[in-house]
Amino acid sequence: KVPVLTVWDVHDYGLNDAGAEFKHREAAERLFDFVWAIPESDARRARPGVYGSWMLGPEGAQMQIIMLDTRYFRSPLKATDEMGAPGKERYLPDNDPSKTMLGDQQW
């Protein structure tokens, strides 16, 4: 028996490049739980986001797998001011220290 560990793919979230501003993120998470048959007893059902951590393997030879949710809590991306310009095609670097990719829960 092999466990299947799941987290958002680039398009699973429901809107390309969306983060915490996605107004349907809670519905997307419920659908994710349904499609992947996440058990009601799973900790991910009791909190927002689909991140998780699992210990796998026999005693003394275990490994930890950590899967991050980089969409549910992520601050909005900074849109380009010059569409298509080299290095500025869609988004710009954003050094705003108040922005987050993981949110407080995962950090």
Question: Could you tell me what each predicted segment is?
Answer:
Residues K1-W107:
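Metal-dependent phosphoester/phosphodiester hydrolase catalytic core
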